[in-house]
Amino acid sequence: MLEIVLSNRFKKDLKLAKKRGLDLNLMDKVVSSLASCQELDEKSHDHPLSGNFEGFRECHILPDWLLIYRVDDEEVFLFLSRTGSHSDLF
């Protein structure tokens, strides 16, 4: 199981998600799957990012609720970078 590390920006994004009334249990399920190195469902559209987010991956919790994360090279940490809608993140 990977150790989960939250960025400061992710913590702010999480507060906004709570304020918007999003179901944080859905995020917990996705993060638990990632932390235990399980593959995500096809509907999550997990894929690598490029540009400013090169080295990171993105998955969909809901169609317009995304999670940007990175697994470190030694596969010890799961770094949660951002969460939010497409317009929030890009």
Functional labels for PLM-detected ranges:
Residues 1-63, 72-78, 83, 87-90:
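Basic, Lys/Arg-enriched alpha-helical interface segments
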